[in-house]
C-alpha cells in the first residue's frame, strides 16, 4: 500500500460566514475564508471547505480564531472563460482556540512537470514545482509549490517522476 502524506495545520481568523459549496456522497460541504498570518506578519486569506457536521460541532462567528487541521485539495474548475486550478483546505478537525498562530504543511508527492528555476525581480532564487499528491481511490491533488534559495537550486535539477517530501 502506498504511503499518503497530505496534512496541513492552520490557525487563523474566520473572515466570513460559511456558505454552501456542494454535496458529495450525501455530505454537505460549506466554504469559508480563513485569514492566516505568515511569520513575516503578512496575512493570507485561504479558502477552507468543511462538512456541515464539523461546522455544527464548532459554532464560530466572524473574527473568531480557529485551529484547523486537514488536507490540501485541488480540482480543475471548468468555467466558460477557461479552466483554472482551485486549491483549498479540506477541514478534518476544527476548534475555537486562542493559541499563537501555528501554520504547517507536510506533503509527499511526485513531480509531474519539469521544475522551473528563476530569479524574482528582487534577485531571490525560486523554483516552481507541480507536485502530484496521491489520495485514496486512485485520485491525486495537483499542487503548485514554490521552493526558495538552496532548495530551489536542488529542485531545479530533479526530473519529472521524482518523489519529493515538503514541510
Regions found by a protein language model. Give the residues of each.
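Single-stranded nucleic acid-binding surfaces, predominantly the OB-fold ssDNA-binding core
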Residues: 1-167
Amino acid at each position: 500500500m502506498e504511503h499518503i502524506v497530505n496534512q496541513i495545520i492552520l490557525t487563523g481568523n474566520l473572515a466570513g460566514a460559511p456558505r454552501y459549496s456542494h454535496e458529495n456522497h450525501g455530505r454537505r460541504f460549506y466554504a469559508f475564508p480563513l485569514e492566516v498570518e505568515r511569520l513575516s506578519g503578512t496575512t493570507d486569506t485561504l479558502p477552507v471547505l468543511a462538512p456541515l457536521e464539523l461546522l455544527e460541532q464548532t459554532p464560530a462567528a466572524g473574527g473568531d480564531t480557529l485551529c484547523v487541521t486537514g488536507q490540501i485539495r485541488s480540482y480543475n474548475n471548468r468555467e466558460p472563460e477557461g479552466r483554472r486550478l482551485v486549491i483549498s483546505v479540506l477541514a478534518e478537525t476544527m476548534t475555537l482556540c486562542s493559541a499563537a498562530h501555528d501554520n504547517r504543511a507536510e506533503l509527499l508527492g511526485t513531480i509531474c512537470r519539469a521544475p522551473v528555476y528563476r530569479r524574482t525581480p528582487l534577485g531571490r532564487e525560486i523554483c516552481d514545482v507541480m507536485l502530484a499528491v496521491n489520495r485514496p481511490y486512485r485520485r491525486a491533488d495537483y499542487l503548485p509549490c514554490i521552493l526558495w534559495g538552496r532548495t530551489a537550486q536542488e529542485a531545479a535539477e530533479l526530473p519529472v517522476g521524482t518523489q519529493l517530501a515538503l514541510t
